[in-house]
Amino acid sequence: MLVWLAEHLVQFYSGFNVFSYLTFRAIVSLLTALFLSLWMGPRLIAWLQKLQIAQVVRNDGPESHFSKRGTPTMGGLMILTSITISVLMWAYPSNPYVWCVLFVLVGYGIVGFIDDYRKVVRKDTKGLIVRWKYFWQSVIALAVAFTMFAVGKDTPATQLAVPFFKDIMPQLGLWYVLLAYFVIVGTSNAVNLTDGLDGLAIMPTVFVAAGLALVAWATGNMNFAGYLHIPYVRFAGELVVVCTAIVGAGLGFLWFNTYPAQVFMGDVGSLALGGALGTIAVLLRQEFLLLIMGGVFVVETLSVILQVGSFKLRGQRIFRMAPIHHHYELKGWPEPRVIVRFWIISLMLVLIGLATLKVR
């Protein structure tokens, strides 16, 4: 919104021209989301404690987690609020891609909020019934997928970018909608599964968002997109502002979520952040790149699928506990060691993903 205001004020003072620069708005978007998150943190934590909205800890989980009982949850509210305000302030409101991401962010946030509310307020350990959770996730994802398809039909915006191959960019047609659906819903639930230790999910989210910010900048620039042999997508550049807002809000949340956590993000945060990352990757035509950069989320999800599948088919478990971060805890790794090592792996995967843009 401030961009529009600056465009009207530039005739009175040329300094307002700085608002037209994407790099400037990306930086202030990060800082705005960061400061908002840091400001809201203590207030939200105190409010959640007053309402006794605390994390539910599984009795069959690692014993070290029992001390987490009573820690406030639903801290994702500060993340979503910070991102939304920052994006509305610094992104061009006429950009349809920005609204697509915000729609998924807020929509999945509402689904996660209802799930958390049922768990911690109504004391329903199952939360939102699984079929209803997937139903609303699907409705939101399909609504955005069809909208994005209508905006970019038969353009590079609906092509598929394949890592390592510069000349393979097939036009997906309606398959675009199906792919977008699975990426958005899948990433949302993958981040949700990863959110099991203090700071474990938020830092890989920050790393991936930072990586996608660089990709968005290149994808929205015709010269760089041509140089890297990736699809040039007309509205993609403005997603840099969205990505940096996620980075800022995530770092602000980490201030309170680092071990030992003062607050957990809850499903309201993890479902929304995962959905937003998936949506951004689809808009940038970098679904395969997200698979690489978000490798930690992928492995966490696969560990659950393999564990459940193995137990149903063979009656045996592959891991001591799934998702896989609990497996390492039960092997005797201290929680901070698991967290930091997963962070390091996540950073490496983001860098490898970015390198694939050039290795073609």
From Swiss-Prot:
List the GO molecular function terms. Answer: metal ion binding; phospho-N-acetylmuramoyl-pentapeptide-transferase activity; UDP-N-acetylmuramoyl-L-alanyl-D-glutamyl-meso-2,6-diaminopimelyl-D-alanyl-D-alanine:undecaprenyl-phosphate transferase activity
Q: What is this protein called?
A: Phospho-N-acetylmuramoyl-pentapeptide-transferase
Q: Where, per UniProt, does this protein localize? A: Cell inner membrane
Catalysed reaction, written as an equation: UDP-N-acetyl-alpha-D-muramoyl-L-alanyl-gamma-D-glutamyl-meso-2,6-diaminopimeloyl-D-alanyl-D-alanine + di-trans,octa-cis-undecaprenyl phosphate = di-trans,octa-cis-undecaprenyl diphospho-N-acetyl-alpha-D-muramoyl-L-alanyl-D-glutamyl-meso-2,6-diaminopimeloyl-D-alanyl-D-alanine + UMP
**Any single GO BP term:** cell wall organization
User: CDD domains this protein is in?
Assistant: GT_MraY (cd06852)
Provide the family line.
Answer: Belongs to the glycosyltransferase 4 family. MraY subfamily.
Q: Quick check: keyword Transmembrane helix in the entry?
A: yes
For this protein, what is the EC number?
2.7.8.13
What's its membrane topology? Answer: Multi-pass membrane protein
Q: In which pathway does it act?
A: Cell wall biogenesis; peptidoglycan biosynthesis
The record's top EC class is transferase
Q: What does this gene product do? A: Catalyzes the initial step of the lipid cycle reactions in the biosynthesis of the cell wall peptidoglycan: transfers peptidoglycan precursor phospho-MurNAc-pentapeptide from UDP-MurNAc-pentapeptide onto the lipid carrier undecaprenyl phosphate, yielding undecaprenyl-pyrophosphoryl-MurNAc-pentapeptide, known as lipid I.
The cofactors named for this UniProt entry are:
Mg(2+)
Q: Which cysteines are joined by disulfide bonds?
A: none
Cellular component GO terms, alphabetical: plasma membrane
Lineage of producing organism: Bacteria, Pseudomonadati, Pseudomonadota, Gammaproteobacteria, Enterobacterales
